[in-house]
A protein has these predicted regions:
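STAS-like cytosolic regulatory interaction modules
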Residues: 1-57, 63-102
């Protein structure tokens, strides 16, 4: 199995937000998981305005982070609509908050 190429994606904490940039793809999801999870406490927003594209692995990363945030009592909002996000949310029937409807 081929190893995904290094990604240009990165993440930083800014107040109550996790701010993502670059392509959220398979390589990014693997690279960013530990870093994002370590910064998740108190997050209310996922800022995607500097994300260039999202694939299914990137969506899985965001949805899992959102689930962890909800479990801690937050209701994270998503800001920005990178290429691929809306189509994948529709395909997986996710709400705008990256949750499965009840």
């Amino acid at each position: 199995m081929a190893v995904p190429a290094a990604s240009d994606a990165h993440i930083r904490r800014d107040g109550d937000a996790l701010v993502f940039a670059g392509a959220l793809d398979r390589a990014a999801a693997a690279a960013l998981w530990v870093q994002a999870a370590a910064q998740l406490a108190g997050v209310q927003r996922f800022v995607l305005t500097n994300v260039t594209t999202v694939d299914s692995a990137g969506l899985a990363l965001l949805a899992e982070l959102a689930a962890h945030a909800r479990a801690a009592g937050a209701v994270p909002r998503v800001e920005g609509q990178p290429v691929g996000l809306a189509d994948l949310q529709a395909a997986y029937r996710l709400t705008p908050e990256l949750d499965f409807p009840a």
